[in-house]
Each structure stands twice: as structure tokens, then as C-alpha cells.
Amino acid sequence: MTNSLSAESARVGSGLRIGVLALQGDFREHLRAAAESGAEGVSVRRPRELDGLDGLIIPGGESTAIDKLARAFELAGPLRERIAGGLPVYGSCAGMILLASDIADPATDLSGAPQQTFGGLDMTVRRNAFGRQRESFETDLDFKGLEFSATDADVAPVHAVFIRGPWVERVGPGVEILAQVEPADPEHASHTAELPGAARIVAVRSGRLLATSFHPEVTGEKRVHELFIRMIRGEA
């Protein structure tokens, strides 16, 4: 199932330079999504490649690997500064983890030091919360903020793919919840004791920061990227 952009929406990103953190993960799919919106997609691997960007996407992948590589390439500090300075950023799956202020279950390195994040969103996330790779699942979500895509006053649900995705366990007062989901299989979902029967938060926004637990770039769901572009332009 896909939600392709209309002819008008397909150029919504025209004139924008959108970076995609290209250290690890499915950055190519996000570069393609940026290009399909009419924006210039730019691979970001070095601090200087942050210059001149209108927005940045942090892709899905392994949050621990992206964290380590960002520090190795001396990107972590500049990324934190740009995010704190107001750079619009969209984080998908691992990107959601890296935008969080807190991780409930951070991985640790050989010295016992916990993984780091870039921060920006006042929230606590839990890694791999929906289970292992084989427990990956797809579902339709009611997603706030997509009114621009309404047909006959109705907004079609977002078809979401969850691949070892995180969920959000706490949001601060400035963070808006955009979408929630019931765990597809509570027996496989990790760490459910504290929130029995509760819907899991899987998409949030704060200012010009956007994060989802799922991978819209995998299903051809274009509207989440369009929402991010409209956020960059101040239209959403």
C-alpha cells in the first residue's frame, strides 16, 4: 500500500536542501523520498556537510552504530548544536531514539558507558520495544497533522511498518503525540508490565522536530516526509 504525492505535493520540497545522516541504516530510501518531493537530498557524513541544510533526516538502522559513528566522524557535537539551534529534524526508528532526551534501556559499550543521543525531544524511549526482527509487523495508524492530504474531508490512515521499533514511554509538556498503536502481540512486546493494555506512542512532534517509530520510506508512504517538509517551510 502506498500514498503517492499529488502533482502539487510532489514539488512541495522544491528549492530545499534536506540532509540525510548517511552513516548507517536505510539512508538511501530517505534520500529517494527527499528527491521525490522535489528537494535536493544530501548525504551527511562530515560536520561541514551540515552547512546550508534546510532540514535533516536521521534514518532507521542501529541507533548504537549511528551513535558510535557520529562520534568517530566528529558529527555528534555539531549535530547536537544544530538541533538545539533550531534545525528541523525528522528521526525514523533509530532516528527517534537518537532524538530522545532519555533512553529507558540504553545499550552500553565495553567500558559500561551508555549510548548517547543527540537530544532535542523531551521524551523517554525504549529500544526494540515491539520485539525482535521476526516480530516485525504492519498496521494502519490514525496520524495527526496530515489534514493537507484529506480527500472528501477524510484523512486516509498511515500504513506503518515496525521493524524492531522503539516506542515512547514518556513525553514532556512540549511534545505532541501524533500516533499511537496497540502492540500487535503483547506476548512478544518487550517490557509491558508497567503499561499493561496501554496504547504505545509511535509518533511525536515538538516544534520543528518530528519522530516516528516506524519506516514510512519502506512502504512508499510519502505523507510523513511531506509533513516534515511543510514543517521546514512553517506551513504545518
Swiss-Prot record:
Task: List positions binding L-glutamine.
Answer: G61, E62, S63, R127, I163, R164
Q: Does the keyword Ribonucleoprotein apply?
A: no
> What pathway does the annotation place this protein in?
Cofactor biosynthesis; pyridoxal 5'-phosphate biosynthesis
**Keywords of this entry:** Glutamine amidotransferase, Hydrolase, Lyase, Pyridoxal phosphate
E.C. number: 4.3.3.6, 3.5.1.2
Active site (catalytic residues): C93, H215, E217
Reaction equation(s) it catalyzes? aldehydo-D-ribose 5-phosphate + D-glyceraldehyde 3-phosphate + L-glutamine = pyridoxal 5'-phosphate + L-glutamate + phosphate + 3 H2O + H(+); L-glutamine + H2O = L-glutamate + NH4(+)
Known function: Catalyzes the hydrolysis of glutamine to glutamate and ammonia as part of the biosynthesis of pyridoxal 5'-phosphate. The resulting ammonia molecule is channeled to the active site of PdxS.
List the protein's name. Pyridoxal 5'-phosphate synthase subunit PdxT
- Whose protein is this, by species? Pseudarthrobacter chlorophenolicus (strain ATCC 700700 / DSM 12829 / CIP 107037 / JCM 12360 / KCTC 9906 / NCIMB 13794 / A6) (Arthrobacter chlorophenolicus)
What gene is behind this protein?
Answer: pdxT
